[in-house]
């Protein structure tokens, strides 16, 4: 026998999960890789039993291999997510989209004239950024498990949530700075627009990741 049965593949999958590999895409990838190694070993020596082949494959991989792959995959996905985030935000700062970003900034600046205390207005703007954690948290909670499975790519894409609490502290700091130096209103609004673009880009990328996963693994 050179090919593993569905039952044997299920046994290998359970073995992979025993190493605390909880992410579905990694479980599938590592199971496929382990199975292919076992089948290669079996072709070389068809007289071996399933458990003998599995033991030889285990020796090739080592005890730490699976967690090392998980760690490496996290780094790769994080770098790719950061790259996509930078690209998406940069697109908003290129012609013609930058015109909309500039007009939005001008609108925010003009609104500040209607406030007796512009520093309070600026603080409120940064406080509003915190509200973007609501849709991202919703997407994460809703898709934390898709068909009962957890995905590392979804977890990485929702990592932006951890940044939102900082906006509260930033709002207080900005408020004090603008109160002492009103000239900082314009650069502060520019900063706010960029952070706003990061927030909406984060929501867009998270939804995109979830959609791609559902298509790739044919999930609903």
Q: Where does each model-flagged region fall?
A:
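Cytosolic juxtamembrane regions of integral membrane proteins
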Residues: 48-107
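Cytosolic-side membrane-entry/anchor segment at the start of a transmembrane helix
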Residues: 1-12, 16, 78-85, 139-157
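Aromatic-enriched hydrophobic runs in primary sequence
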Residues: 19, 23, 27, 31, ...
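Hydrophobic alpha-helical bundles in membrane proteins
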Residues: 86-220
């Amino acid at each position: 026998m050179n090919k593993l049965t569905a039952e044997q593949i299920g046994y290998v999958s359970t073995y992979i999960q025993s190493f605390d590999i909880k992410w579905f895409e990694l479980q599938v990838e590592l199971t496929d890789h382990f199975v292919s190694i076992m089948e290669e070993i079996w072709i070389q020596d068809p007289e071996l039993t399933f458990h003998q082949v599995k033991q030889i494959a285990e020796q090739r991989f080592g005890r730490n291999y699976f967690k090392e792959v998980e760690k490496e995959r996290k780094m790769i996905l994080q770098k790719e997510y950061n790259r996509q985030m930078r690209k998406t935000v940069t697109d908003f700062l290129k012609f013609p989209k930058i015109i909309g970003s500039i007009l939005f900034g001008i609108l925010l600046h003009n609104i500040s004239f209607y406030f007796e205390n512009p520093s309070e207005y600026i603080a409120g703007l940064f406080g509003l950024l915190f509200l973007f954690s609501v849709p991202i948290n919703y997407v994460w909670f809703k898709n934390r498990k898709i068909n009962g499975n957890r995905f590392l790519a979804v977890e990485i894409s929702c990592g932006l949530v951890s940044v939102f609490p900082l906006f509260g502290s930033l709002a207080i700091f900005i408020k004090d700075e603008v109160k002492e130096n009103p000239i900082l209103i314009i650069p502060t609004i520019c900063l706010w627009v960029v952070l706003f673009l990061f927030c909406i880009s984060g929501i867009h990328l998270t939804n995109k990741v979830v959609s791609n996963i559902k298509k790739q693994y044919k999930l609903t």
